[in-house]
Amino acid sequence: MTRIPVEGLVFDVDVAGPEDGEPVLLLHGFPHNRLSWSEVSPVLHPAGLRTIAPDQRGYSPDARPAETGAYALRELAGDALGILSALDIESAHVVGHDWGAVVGWYLAARTPERVRSLTAVAFPHLDAYRYALRVDPEQREHSGYIEALGAESAAADFLADGAARLEAWYRQPGAGVLSEEQIQRYLRTHTAPGTLRAALRWYGAGTLLSDEPLGPVTVPTTYVWSERDPAVGAFASEQTAHHVTGDYRSVRLAGVSHWQPQQFPETVAAEILRRVGHG
């Protein structure tokens, strides 16, 4: 693990693979951390790819601003760019899952010169998602959890009774692919003082429910999504094609829930390799 300073914060980052390999930035979601890529990265390294997997803002112990506004999307994207710059990387293939995909879409739309390609997993283009919230009752039902997770009391609720609700989140139907070792690893991380409260500030910042348009993505893009995802419906995922003007591939997984990197790491890795031209 490498510690990388960016604008007064310090991020815990796993950097692995050949030093001269094409860089692949791996951005995790909630409620995980950089270890969510632990079964994906080893598949990428033999193809000559160098992986950079940070614990993002709120997850790295020394990157936890107290103000909810510090978790705005532009700040999260700035962290990712700062980590790349600290490693002397001008541009990288970006891969994101869940919230990591949200950051990835933002990077691809706003700083395409830094993004060689995008592989977004489990979260559609933000404009497609927000449109679905307006017109698709199913998506509104899927997204009912967002405001609750952004509430000031959310962390305490998750951690009450020995973190029963947090543990139930990892054991929810469809997420049972997580091994007992993985569940305990995430529980140890997110029950540490300050971790969960900081991670939930991503929701408190209001990014997902904002009306600010993101704009089209021009870089080569693959979107991997699941028909049994409890957070994102098919309508939002299918609308994503209308917001990518670069080469685009949509990959729909059957019988999979929301945590694809853990459920099917080899499938996710294969789509990354295909997108970056090594598959």
Name each region found by the language model.
Residues R3, T51-A53, Y223, S250:
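Conserved beta-strand scaffold positions in the cores of enzyme catalytic domains, especially
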Residues V15-A63:
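Conserved HGGG/HGGXW glycine-rich cap/lid loop of the alpha/beta-hydrolase fold
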Residues H278-G279:
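Alpha/beta-hydrolase-fold serine-hydrolase catalytic core, especially in secreted/extracellular enzymes
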Residues M1-V10:
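N-terminal cap/lid segment of alpha/beta-hydrolase-fold proteins
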Residues P5, G17-E19, G215-V217:
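Short, flexible hinge/linker loops that cap or flank conserved catalytic cores
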Residues L9-F11, P23, Y59-V95, W99-L253, ...:
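Flexible "cap/lid" subdomain of the alpha/beta-hydrolase fold that forms the substrate-access gate
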